[in-house]
């Protein structure tokens, strides 16, 4: 699983860094009174996700084949992690179907389950910003892999509307493609 779940050497590196930091901190006597530290007004990276939050897809306006329900997992190939089962999510397997949601912020993405049938989403933000996002990941071939995809990260702060359409481009060898959204990611 790459850098997300390191093997023993990666875990040891993280543990050693934490130990070193704590030991150095404890060498000094504690301050008599704690001082609160706030987040600087001017961030080092203006596109930081410091205001990141989830937005429920339940609020989306659905057209065509989008549904807010639990998919029929038993009919779908690929492994599934139990923590994502038994819950409703926003999903479609019908190319051309559109879901639209309003949000406030400067960035929008989605936390998805990308399985063997993961497709391509076309997006339009405020009728101007357009693009596509491929939902599949190399781990999606045998697993409904949880991952986040970003549609835009540098919007003008404020109110926006995004429309998502399952693309015909995601179909492979006549098989259907799908999109499964657990949460929208907004900053």
Predicted features along the sequence, with ranges:
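Conserved catalytic region of serine esterases and O-acyltransferases that act on ester linkages
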Residues: 1-187
